[in-house]
Curated annotation (Swiss-Prot):
One of its GO terms (cellular component) is nuclear speck. Required for pre-mRNA splicing as component of the spliceosome. Core component of the splicing-dependent multiprotein exon junction complex (EJC) deposited at splice junctions on mRNAs. The EJC is a dynamic structure consisting of core proteins and several peripheral nuclear and cytoplasmic associated factors that join the complex only transiently either during EJC assembly or during subsequent mRNA metabolism. Its main location: cytoplasm. This is Protein CASC3.
Length: 754
């Protein structure tokens, strides 16, 4: 209590002194003077004895107060003074501190005197104190409004600006103390439009715009005037062709050749347009697949090819041959069709319309071709390129996906090969094909074409296989074709065999081919299609043997694949084999172009798979297979599919007819998976194309043997070493051994828990 009183008294004294003093410095001095006088005022009243007693009290009081308390008091006092705003100068504060320390002794005496002596004095002092405190408070409120008072309860919370308008009631959004206060100043709030929203009336009616353009983002490129349909000229200016044309650019753009390797539905869809697009497809003959369309489109125009096709169909090859010559000497109208068919996508477009006619002409061609084999003239007419194209287009039609792949990849190869081969065939047949001879030379020059040849043969074989069934029905309808073809196939086949032997493919193969020819002859329909197919297969076999032996095989294979019943192919093959290192190419092609596994799987799926396999160098064997499926008696020893399995690697040669080259087929076509897939008459034979896969697919090999009733080994494919890739695949799955570790870790964790 005493301490509080003292503090109050000091505060009042200070304020009084401040009032008295005129300036800050003066007030500091007057402080000390007035305080000293005040402190001394009571002293005269005190008696000496009381003074002594007061002093002793003082000391006892001051020990607590002066020792520690003095500093504290002086702090409090200075704080009070500061709080009250009575002192604004540091000098004053220092003086006050000194004063308080001096006054401490006298003040306790003054207090103790009233307590001990006279309550009246105390009352008088108390009154003085109260008055002074009131004055100080009034002064503070008047002079110090708006200044922060630190924690003494006198702080003013209101801003000085708002103090004047204290009485006015503020809106919630303007009252800063209200949570609903909306700031109106500052960068962040310049976009705060709350409360300013004014609904603008939008035009009503049918044609009203749903948005306004004033506020439209600049990057919004929508222009109403651009929404109308564009004219054809505009479209062509924009995209380079009329994008509304369902067939795509029909100007023979090379990009058209970009067909999925599996020419399945894509090629079939285009078949509808094949007649129109064929010209583009015919470009196949030309450069690589990319350029096929443009070149061939020039060479073969839909009108021309169709007319020749229609003519040749009924008449068989004879009528077709001249048109072929007209096309390129080596290309028959059917060739253009096939070429078109081959065309990556266009062939498929053309395929639909041409399919019926094409298959018939093809059959007719085949029949004539078979005859033509006897008379190389037919083959010559259909230069290898023509033959290949025919087969490809047919295959594409029937086996949309695979042919496309073959066509796409081998298209340029075929072209080259065709160019090469035509001359040989033509020469052999005695027919002089200007284009053909040139092509033949080109083929001889370029070994890679042999790959193409193989692929050609593959596509042809496949097409033949595929088409054969369809062709059989069609051929049945063709009296000429069926009878002539049947008769011709034997002769053609025998000639083919002879040609093959001439080519130096394999005498054994020749025998096998002959057998196959006989088998194919057994059924008229089969005779027509199978004979050509078988011949193609036989050629393929020879080709595969050649592949083992050298390029000649390829030439033969190509011929076989291309013209199952075409003499041209044979002759061209014979000629090619020597100059062309087909085996390597075949292996490479098969290896790099079609993974034996990958490629053959799809091929089988097409049911033309046998044909597809030949391009891989297994084509030859597939040809053998075809005969077997066609004529199980042909190779009775091979009929035992399971037996070929064991022999697939080493014994396969034995299982295969003597004509077949077993050693070459070191790698049995392991990929004869879908016997059912081979939906030829020869569904049995799995194509050796999978030969490369033997290591991985020994069982498939067995299947192929079982299916063909003959052990089929693709020597080239076997030689090709893409087979190693399958093991990698198997290794990946095998590598999945993390699960057991997980179990162990779980067990360990369980043990730990337990």
């Amino acid at each position: 209590m005493a301490d509080r009183r003292r503090r109050r008294r000091r505060a009042s004294q200070d304020s009084e002194e401040e009032d008295e003093s005129a300036s800050g410095s003066e007030s500091g001095r007057s402080f000390s003077a007035s305080r000293k006088t005040r402190g001394r005022e009571p002293e005269p009243v005190e008696s000496p004895a009381e003074r002594v007693a007061a002093k002793s009290d003082d000391e006892s009081e001051c020990v607590s107060e002066d020792g520690v308390g003095e500093a504290v008091l002086s702090d409090y006092d200075s704080a009070d003074l500061e709080e009250n705003g009575s002192h604004t100068e540091g000098g004053e504060e220092e003086e006050e501190a000194e004063h308080f320390s001096e006054e401490e002794a006298s003040r306790p005496a003054a207090e103790s005197k009233p307590v001990a002596d006279a309550p009246t004095e105390e009352l008088v002092e108390g009154e003085e104190r109260d008055e002074s405190v009131k004055e100080v408070k009034a002064d503070e409120k008047g002079n110090l409004a708006g200044e922060r008072q630190s924690g003494d309860g006198q702080e003013s919370t209101e801003d000085p600006e708002n103090k004047g308008s204290k009485g006015q009631k503020l809106d919630d959004d303007e009252d800063r103390k209200n949570p609903a206060y909306i700031p109106r100043k500052g960068l962040f709030f310049e976009h705060d439009v709350r409360g300013q929203a004014t609904e603008e009336e939008r035009p009503k009616g049918r044609n009203r715009k749903l948005w306004k353009d004033e506020g439209r983002w600049e990057h919004d490129k929508f222009r109403e005037e651009e929404q109308a349909p564009k004219s054809r000229d505009e479209l062509i200016a924009f995209y380079g062709y009329d994008i509304r044309n369902g067939t795509g650019p029909s100007d023979g753009r090379s990009y058209r050749s970009r067909k999925p390797r599996h020419a399945g539905s894509p090629s079939r869809e285009p078949r509808r347009y094949r007649e129109g697009d064929k010209s583009v497809r015919s470009s196949w003959q030309g450069p690589p697949p990319g350029h096929r369309n443009a070149p061939q489109s020039v060479t073969v125009q839909s009108g021309q090819p169709l007319a020749p096709l229609s003519a040749p169909k009924p008449s068989g090859r004879p009528s077709t041959q001249p048109p072929q010559r007209s096309f390129q000497g080596s290309r028959a109208p059917s060739a253009p069709h096939r070429t078109e068919g081959r065309g990556p996508s266009k062939p498929s477009l053309d395929g639909a319309p041409l399919r019926g006619p094409r298959s018939q002409p093809v059959e007719g061609e085949r029949g004539p071709r078979l005859r033509g084999r006897s008379s190389h003239a037919v083959h010559a007419d259909r230069s290898p390129s023509l033959v290949v194209e025919d087969i490809c287009s047919e295959e594409e039609e029937e086996e949309g996906e695979i042919p496309t792949a073959t066509t796409t990849y081998t298209a340029h190869h075929y072209k080259t090969e065709k160019e090469r081969v035509p001359s040989p065939r033509k020469q052999d047949s005695g027919m002089v094909m200007e284009g053909g001879s040139a092509a033949g030379q080109v083929r001889e020059l370029s070994p890679p074409q042999e790959r193409q040849v193989e692929k050609k043969s593959y596509s042809r074989a496949r097409r033949a296989t595929r088409t054969r069934p369809s062709d059989l029905s069609k051929q049945a309808s063709l009296d000429d074709s069926s009878s002539a073809v049947q008769q011709a196939p034997v002769a053609a086949k025998s000639e083919s065999w002879q040609e093959q032997s001439e080519a130096g493919t394999q005498s054994g193969l020749t025998g096998l081919d002959q057998d196959l020819a006989r088998l194919s002859l057994t059924g008229q329909n089969w005779a027509q299609n199978p004979p050509s197919y078988l011949q193609a297969e036989m050629r393929g076999i020879r080709g595969s043997m050649h592949m083992a032996g050298g390029p000649p095989q390829y030439g033969n294979m190509e011929d076989m694949g291309v013209g199952g019943g075409r003499a041209k192919r044979y002759s061209s093959q014979r000629q090619r084999p020597v100059p062309e290192p087909a085996p390597m190419h075949i292996g490479v092609m098969e290896g790099h172009y079609y993974e034996p596994m990958t490629f053959q799987g799809p091929i089988y799926t097409h049911g033309e798979s046998p044909a597809a396999l030949p391009p891989q160098g297994m084509l030859v064997q597939p040809e053998m297979h075809l005969p077997h499926p066609t004529h199980p008696g042909l190779h009775p020893h091979q009929s035992g599919g399971p037996l070929p399995n064991p022999a697939i690697y080493a014994a396969p040669p034995v299982s295969l007819s003597p004509g077949q080259p077993p050693p070459q087929q070191l790698l049995p076509p392991p990929f004869y998976p879908p016997p059912g897939v081979m939906t030829f008459g020869n569904t049995n034979y799995p194509y050796p194309a999978g030969g490369t896969l033997p290591p991985m697919y020994p069982n498939p090999q067995a299947q192929s043997q079982v299916y063909g009733g003959v052990t089929y080994y693709d020597t080239i494919q076997q030689q090709a070493q893409p087979k190693r890739s399958p093991p990698r695949r198997s290794s990946n799955p095998v590598t999945v051994r993390p699960p057991p570790p997980e179990d162990q870790s779980r067990k360990a964790a369980e043990e730990i828990r337990s």
